[in-house]
């Protein structure tokens, strides 16, 4: 069984507000947030940059592999069974912005948000981009596979073989989400 350890998201919080800025007029004046939770209990979130802003969702993945062989029946009428189970789950860990009084985002360049949640239950959300604003959905994958091989023997002579494979793949996408009391 192989499992990748979970990585914790960066967390920024402020009771009366959170402000992040990159105001200088040069090409490196960008803001990049990846798998980050930013919250303000009683205030606003303000993010400003002269250049581009990127809100990336990291893909966390869980993979398991199990192989099991066993025998059933009496010595003269044996059934040998081999099962291989495989499971893969990949889901995005997004940027979450949550402020009770509102969210203000301004960029002189582009804003690219991958599966980002903008949440301002008692306020408004203002997003301004100088060039372009793009909200992306990020793919989520759930994959299960069962491979089963059965052999039957009677007095040591093989007389039946069966091989079954069952595969289930479910792909969904986590979109960017904007929730506010007023827009």
Please annotate each region the language model reported.
Residues 1-183:
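Binding/recognition "hotspot" determinant
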């Amino acid at each position: 069984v192989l499992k990748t350890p979970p990585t914790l998201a960066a967390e920024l919080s402020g009771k009366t507000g959170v402000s992040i800025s990159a105001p200088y007029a040069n090409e490196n004046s960008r803001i990049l947030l990846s798998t980050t939770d930013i919250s303000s209990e009683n205030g606003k979130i303000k993010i400003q940059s002269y250049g581009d802003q990127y809100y990336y969702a990291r893909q966390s993945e869980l993979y398991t592999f199990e192989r099991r062989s066993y025998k059933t029946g009496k010595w003269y009428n044996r059934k040998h069974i081999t099962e291989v189970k495989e499971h893969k789950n990949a889901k995005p860990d997004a940027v979450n912005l949550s402020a009770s009084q509102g969210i203000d985002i301004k960029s002189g360049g582009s804003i690219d948000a991958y599966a980002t949640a903008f949440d301002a239950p008692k306020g408004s959300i203002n997003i301004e981009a100088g060039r372009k604003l793009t909200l992306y959905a990020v793919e989520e994958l759930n994959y299960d596979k069962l491979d089963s091989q059965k052999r039957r023997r009677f007095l040591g002579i093989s007389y039946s073989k069966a091989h079954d494979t069952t595969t289930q793949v479910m792909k969904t996408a986590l979109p960017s989400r904007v929730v506010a009391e007023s827009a």
